[in-house]
Amino acid sequence: ASLYKATRYARPGLILAGDAGSFIDPLSSFGVKKALSSGWLAGIVANTALIDPDMTEASVNFFDSREKLVYSRYRESSAPFFQSAAQSHGTSYWIERAQAAKKAAVVASDSGLPQADIRNQLDLLESNLPEADVRAAFDEICAQDRLGAVRGKTLRIFEGPGVAGHRIVMEQRLGSALWPSGMRYVRGVDLLQLIEAAMSHDQVPEGWAAYNASGAAVTLPDYLTALSTAFAAGFLEHGIKVS
C-alpha cells in the first residue's frame, strides 16, 4: 500500500477526513485509530460551520493542524516496527520503509510540535505527553509530604480553538515552553480549574475534593493523571519540596 498525505486537509466548504486526507501503512491499528479520530473531528467541524459561520475559518484551520500532527506522529510511531522488520528480513522493501519512517520521525521532531507516543490516543485533543514524563511527575508528587504547587515559570494562558460538546469554540488554553501548542483538558479534567485547586491545597486529596466541589466531578485516577500532566508540561512546579 502506498503512503500519501494532503498538503491541506480542510478549507471552508471542504474537509478531507480519514483516508481521503492521508494513508499510513496498515502495519498495525494506527490507521484505524487515525480514521476514527479524523471522522469524529470532521463531524464537529462541519457542525460548527453550519451553526456558527463566523467560526468556520478557525475550525477548518484547527482540523488541518490536527490532521498534520496525527499523520506525523503515527509515522513517527511506526518507525520502530519497520526498523525491526528491516533487521529481521534485510530486504530492500523493509529497508526503504524503515529509512522513510526514520526520516519522517526526524521531520516530526524538528517541527516544533510536542514529542509524544500516541499509540493509545484517538483524538489528540488531550495531552499526548510521553508517558515516561507523566509517570516521573507522578512519582515526584508521591515523594512530597506537601504538594507545594506553584505556577510554572513559563506558563501562559491564551485563547485558542478547542472542542466543546459538538462544536469548535475559542477557549482559554494553557501553554508552556515544554508544551507551546497548549491544552485545556486531560482525561476530562479542566486544567485551568485543576491548577487553581492544586495551588490552593498542599494535600492532593484536598485539591481533588476542591476541584469536584467547584464543577463536574472526576475520578481520583483521572485527577492524578491530569495533575501529573500539569507538572510534566511545566504548567505547575513544586515550589516547596519537603520529603
Put a short name on every predicted segment:
Residues 1-11, 67-69:
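Flavin (FAD/FMN) cofactor-binding core of flavoprotein oxidoreductases
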Residues 22, 28, 41-97:
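Active-site-proximal substrate-binding core of FAD-dependent oxidoreductases
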Residues 34-45, 193:
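Short amphipathic alpha-helical face segments that pack within enzyme cores
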Residues 70-134:
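Extended amphipathic alpha-helical segments with heptad-repeat/coiled-coil character used for oligomerization
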Residues 116-199, 221-243:
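Acidic, low-complexity/disordered tracts enriched in E/D and polar residues
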